[in-house]
Curated annotation (Swiss-Prot):
Gene that specifies this protein: surA
Domain PpiC residue range list: 174-275, 284-384
BP terms from Gene Ontology: Gram-negative-bacterium-type cell outer membrane assembly; protein folding; protein stabilization
Stated name of the protein: Chaperone SurA
Disulphide bridges: none
Phylogenetic placement of the source organism: Bacteria, Pseudomonadati, Pseudomonadota, Gammaproteobacteria, Enterobacterales
Gene3D superfamilies attached to this UniProt entry: 3.10.50.40, Porin chaperone SurA, peptide-binding domain
A GO CC term attached to the entry: outer membrane-bounded periplasmic space
């Protein structure tokens, strides 16, 4: 429902959550184990929803919106209690990352964003601290949720392949086919003998073609005999239209394919597939690469890691040692260092960070200047490059994500039901 989605959006985008109310006189709306939800907690969200001026499709039931808000607060309380019971702690770095990301999305500096938060409630000196606390609570909830779902979700290759095949089949609708055909036209008044003769001619033509006879040469020959044949060359037509003209199961899958004889409205057709165009093909550049990685750690700061990788780069350039020596003795990627830093074929899109123009024009066996990624500092060596159609790879990933999202929704619901079944929940009607 739209209303549930928006409540979820509000809770997370405004970074609102119910904090314990100390020494505050208020009506208790619900008890969740040893925690309480106050009437003011529910009303605070309801006021926000009204101020947002969003239009909701709400059933006639007068308390529907209030009940949905309360239901969300109960679930959040259960999740937070579960996180606390598992002793989940959030670091200052994690909170700082959230603040940086919010500021980045708003296209402002972190300091400017902090000032915005403080200006929302100048009279309350602890407002910013409460804001930070709310971020911490949300991160706790997300951490325990991710942990639980990771335990519960299993995805089999068969499940992914089922969706993958459906996506590929759906994509067939977007195919365009370049065809040439020879038509042996029929007339309503044709005798049985004429039909048999025409069928025999068509079958002989197909037999010759499958034995290697040149289709273009045959087109020229048939064009001369206009009383028997109609010829059409090199035209594009959507696969869906071709199937509608003949039959739904017509399977066109490769260039040079000969189809026929096929019965159509106007007679017997012999088709040749000249080309196939996938509307959604996705050509990407892949690089065959090795790398040397230096990772920041508890004992090595990012600045020190950067200095170390640039020293390695300079030493390779000066010939003090080779790239392979650096990988074997200095790289922090222990898995690939035993394979000379071999990363295999990787597209620039899958690396997870932007490559500069200098990198993209490197020659084979040339090393890159140090590059920063989420994992640390790299020196890459380009062994080869190629262009590939990533369509099927993308569709496989899409299929996996569809299955994953379905399971996330399903398993999250199961998990919440498990939390409810083992909890004491009392809703107090006023």
């Amino acid at each position: 429902m739209k209303i549930c989605i928006f409540i979820f959006f509000y809770i997370f985008s405004s970074i609102f959550y119910v904090l314990a109310k100390n020494n505050q006189v208020d009506n208790i709306t619900a008890i969740v184990n040893d925690e309480i939800i106050l009437n003011s907690d529910v009303n605070e969200i309801l006021v926000f929803l009204k101020k947002s001026k969003k239009k909701f499709i709400i059933p006639l039931k007068s308390d529907f919106l209030k009940e949905k808000v309360l239901e969300k607060l109960i679930v959040d309380s259960l999740i937070l209690q579960e996180a606390n019971s598992k002793n989940i702690n959030i670091t200052k770095e994690q909170i700082d990352t959230v603040i940086k990301n919010i500021a980045l999305k708003k296209h402002i500096s972190v300091d400017h964003f902090k000032k915005q938060i403080l200006l929302r409630n100048i009279k309350n000196p602890s407002y910013y601290d409460n804001f930070i606390k709310k971020i911490e609570i949300l991160l706790k909830m997300k951490t325990i949720q991710d942990y639980e779902l990771h335990k519960r979700i299993n995805i089999s290759e068969q499940e992914v392949n089922t969706i993958f095949k459906k996506l590929i089949k759906d994509n067939e609708k977007f195919k365009k086919i370049n065809l040439s055909y020879i038509l042996l036209p029929s007339l309503k008044q044709d005798s049985d003998n004429a039909v048999r003769n025409r069928t025999k001619i068509a079958e002989n033509i197909v037999y010759k073609l499958k034995k290697g006879y040149d289709f273009e040469k045959l087109l020229i020959e048939c064009e001369k005999n206009k009383s028997t044949f109609i010829v059409k060359k090199m035209f594009w037509k959507p696969l869906l239209d071709i199937q509608n003209s003949f039959f739904k199961t017509l399977n066109i899958f490769k260039k040079g394919q000969i189809l026929g004889p096929i019965v159509g409205d106007k007679g017997l057709y012999i088709l040749k597939v000249n080309d196939i165009h996938h509307k959604k093909e996705n050509i990407v550049t892949e690089f065959y690469m090795q790398h040397c990685l230096i990772k920041p750690s508890v004992i090595l700061t990012n600045t020190e890691a950067k200095k170390k990788i640039f020293n390695i780069y300079e030493n390779i350039k000066k010939g003090i040692y080779t790239f392979d020596d650096a990988v074997k003795n200095l790289s922090d990627d222990y898995y690939s260092s035993n394979k000379k830093g071999d990363l295999g074929w990787i597209s620039k899109e899958s690396l997870g960070f932007d490559l500069n123009k200098k990198f993209l024009i490197l020659d084979k066996n040339e090393i890159s200047e140090p590059v920063k990624s989420n994992w640390g500092w790299h020196i890459f060596k380009i062994l080869d490059r190629r262009q590939v159609d990533a369509f099927y790879k993308l569709k496989k990933n899409q299929a996996f994500n569809i299955v994953l999202n379905q399971k996330i929704i399903s398993e999250k619901n199961h998990w919440i039901e498990d939390l409810k079944n083992t909890a004491y929940i009392e809703i107090i009607r006023s």
